[in-house]
Curated annotation (Swiss-Prot):
Gene, per the UniProt record: secY
Location, primary (coarse class): membrane
One MF term in the entry's GO annotations: signal sequence binding
Family of the protein in this entry: Belongs to the SecY/SEC61-alpha family.
Something else known: Was identified as a high-confidence drug target.
Protein's membrane topology: Multi-pass membrane protein
UniProt protein name: Protein translocase subunit SecY
Subunit structure comment from the entry: Component of the Sec protein translocase complex. Heterotrimer consisting of SecY, SecE and SecG subunits. The heterotrimers can form oligomers, although 1 heterotrimer is thought to be able to translocate proteins. Interacts with the ribosome. Interacts with SecDF, and other proteins may be involved. Interacts with SecA.
Annotated localization: Cell membrane
Transmembrane domains' residue ranges: 18-38, 78-98, 124-144, 157-177, 180-200, 215-235, 272-292, 318-338, 382-402, 403-423
GO BP terms in the entry: protein transport by the Sec complex; SRP-dependent cotranslational protein targeting to membrane, translocation
Residue ranges of coiled coil: none
Keyword Transmembrane: yes
Species assigned in the record: Mycobacterium tuberculosis (strain ATCC 25618 / H37Rv)
Keywords: Cell membrane, Membrane, Protein transport, Translocation, Transmembrane, Transmembrane helix, Transport
Length: 441
C-alpha cells in the first residue's frame, strides 16, 4: 500500500492529477465555509444549535448530508451539488419519454456532450429555484424552526436578490469544479465532492454522539459502521463473470481472435447512484412544505402537511424507511436499464466475432444477458436498500428514536465507500498502465 502510494506520487502525470483534485477539494471546502453576503453568521450558528436539538434535527441532518453543513449555514456553496443531481435525475428520466434524448444517448461522445449541456442548463434553473426557496425560508424564519433570531438582518429586495445570485453562482461553480475533477483529476467529480462534504462532518457528529449518548452507544455505532464498511467492500467487489470466446479471423495475412475473456457484471451494477438519487428526492416534499408554510405564515392542517410532518421528517419512522427503501429499489433498476443495454452489448460482441459458449450470437445472447442481469440486480438493489436503512432501524431501536447522526448512517457509508473504491480503482488503473504495483491485490 505504501509503495503504491509512493509510486503514484513519483509519476508526474498521476501526481498532477492527485494534486489538482486536492486543490479543487480545498477550494470547495473554503466556499462551503464562506458565509453569503447579508447573512448574520453568529445568529445562524446559534439557530442551527437550537434547531438540531429539536424534533426537526433528523431532517436537518439529511439536508446537510450533501452540502457538508453548508446549506443551513447559508454559505456561498449552500445549494451545492443538489441542483446538478436533480437535473441528472430529470434528464435521465426524460431519456425514456423523449425519443430525441434516447437518440442522443446512442450517439456516443457527441450525444453525451449534448446531454451534459442540457443537464447544465437545467441545473442552473433548479439552482435559481432552490436558492430562492432557501432565502425565502430564511427570511420568513421557516428554514430553522424554533429560532427567533434574525438570520438575514437586512431583508430588502436588493439584499435578498444578491444572496440568491451568490448561491446560484456558487452552485454553477460547484458544478464546474466537479466537471474539472472528472476531466483533469481523479475520480468522478460530483461524487467526490459529496464524499468530501460527508467526511467533513464525521468528527463533529462523532463528538456529538459521544457527548449526548455516552461511550456505549458511540462504540456500538462505530462497530455497526465498521460492519457495514466490511460488507459494502465485500459486495462492491463481487461480480458475475460471463465467459466470452472470440472466434479466429483472418485480416490480410494475419490471424486475429481465438482468445477467451469474460464480461464482468457487478452485483451492485448501479453503484451509489440510486442511494444519492433517493436521498435527494425524499427530502424535497419537506422542503416544499416548509416553503408553503413560510409563504402563508400559518401551519397547514391538510393531509399532506400531516403526512410530511409525521412520516417524511423522521428518518427512523417506518413509513419513511419503506418509502426510502422503495426509491432505492426503483432507481437501481432504472439506472441499470440506462447504463447497461443487453442488445447493444450483444451486437458489439457479434460485430467483433465474440460469443458466449452455449449461447447463439445476436438475440439469444441479449436475452441471456438480460436474464443474468435481472437476477443480479434484484439482490443488488435489496443490498443497497438494507444497508441504507439498517442504521435507521438500529438507532430507532437502540436509542429510542432520538436524533440520528447521518454521517454514520448507511447512506453516508455507502456513498463514501463506493466513491472511495471507485477513486482507488482509477488510481490503480493509472499505476498498472505504467507497470507499477497497485493498491489492490
Amino acid at each position: 500500500m505504501l509503495s503504491a502510494f509512493i509510486s503514484s506520487l513519483r509519476t508526474v502525470d498521476l501526481r498532477r492529477k492527485i494534486l489538482f483534485t486536492l486543490g479543487i477539494v480545498i477550494l470547495y471546502r473554503v466556499g462551503a465555509a464562506l458565509p453569503s453576503p447579508g447573512v448574520n453568521f453568529p445568529n445562524v450558528q446559534q439557530c442551527i444549535k437550537e434547531a438540531s436539538a429539536g424534533e426537526a434535527g433528523q431532517i436537518y441532518s439529511l439536508i446537510n448530508l450533501f452540502s457538508g453543513g453548508a446549506l443551513l449555514k447559508l454559505t456561498v456553496f449552500a445549494v451545492g451539488v443538489m441542483p446538478y443531481i436533480t437535473a441528472s435525475i430529470i434528464v435521465q428520466l426524460l431519456t425514456v419519454v423523449i425519443p430525441r434524448f434516447e437518440e442522443l444517448r446512442k450517439e456516443g461522445q457527441a450525444g453525451q456532450s449534448k446531454m451534459t449541456q442540457y443537464t447544465r442548463y437545467l441545473a442552473i434553473a433548479l439552482a435559481i429555484l432552490q436558492a430562492t426557496s432557501i432565502v425565502a425560508l430564511a427570511a420568513n424564519g421557516g428554514l430553522l424552526q424554533g429560532c427567533s433570531l434574525d438570520i438575514i438582518a437586512d431583508q430588502s429586495i436588493f439584499t435578498l436578490v444578491v444572496i440568491v445570485l451568490v448561491m446560484t453562482g456558487g452552485a454553477a461553480l460547484v458544478m464546474w469544479m466537479g466537471e474539472l475533477i472528472t476531466e483533469r483529476g481523479i475520480g468522478n467529480g460530483m461524487s467526490l465532492l459529496i464524499f468530501v462534504g460527508i467526511a467533513a462532518r464525521i468528527p463533529a457528529e462523532g463528538q456529538s454522539i459521544l457527548e449526548s449518548r455516552g461511550g456505549v452507544v458511540f462504540t456500538a455505532v462505530c462497530a455497526a459502521a465498521l460492519i457495514i464498511i466490511v460488507g459494502v467492500v465485500f459486495v462492491e467487489q463481487g461480480q458475475r463473470r460471463i465467459p466470452v470466446q472470440y472466434a479466429k479471423r483472418m485480416v490480410g495475412r494475419r490471424m486475429y481472435g481465438g482468445t477467451s475473456t469474460y464480461l464482468p457484471l457487478k452485483v451492485n451494477q448501479a453503484g451509489v447512484i440510486p442511494v444519492i438519487f433517493a436521498s435527494s428526492l425524499i427530502y424535497i416534499p419537506h422542503l416544499i412544505t416548509q416553503l408553503i408554510r413560510s409563504g402563508s405564515g400559518v401551519v397547514g392542517n391538510s393531509w399532506w402537511d400531516k403526512f410530511v410532518g409525521t412520516y417524511l421528517s423522521d428518518p427512523s419512522n417506518l413509513v419513511y424507511i419503506g418509502i426510502y427503501f422503495g426509491l432505492i429499489i426503483f432507481f437501481t433498476y432504472f439506472y441499470v436499464s440506462i447504463t447497461f443495454n443487453p442488445d447493444e452489448r450483444a451486437d458489439e460482441m457479434k460485430k467483433f466475432g465474440g460469443f458466449i459458449p452455449g449461447i447463439r450470437p445476436g438475440r439469444p445472447t441479449a436475452d441471456y444477458l438480460r436474464y443474468v442481469l435481472s437476477r443480479i440486480t434484484l439482490p443488488g438493489s435489496i443490498y443497497l436498500g438494507v444497508i441504507a436503512v439498517l442504521p435507521n432501524l438500529f438507532l430507532q431501536i437502540g436509542a429510542g428514536g432520538t436524533v440520528q447522526n447521518l454521517p454514520f448512517g448507511g447512506t453516508a457509508v455507502l456513498i463514501m465507500i463506493g466513491v472511495g473504491l471507485d477513486t482507488v480503482k482509477q488510481i490503480e488503473s493509472q499505476l498498472m498502465q505504467r507497470n507499477y504495483e497497485g493498491f489492490l491485490k
